[in-house]
């Protein structure tokens, strides 16, 4: 297996772990436990980011400031990790993280745990 294939395989496994975390956001539900579990997984997967950042946790959300060392203007990277309810029938479970024919299936694979993962990677 090539280095690129190994890297792609590792990336897929990491993203699968994010997809498999159920983070459904329901109107009126103020509980944050599932989001706190997701944050714990992020801390495990991206320890350097959490060590080097100022992290604020509020209402199930994270605000992270990573101080820079240059005089350039700051940038903003923004994403979300909640997903909508999984209703209807699914060919793959909504939180399965299945990979079939090179495609990763599950809530958040497009909107938007994938972009969050890419930013943190």
Regions found by a protein language model. Give the residues of each.
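Acidic/His- and Gly-rich active-site-bordering loop/insert found
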Residues: 1-117
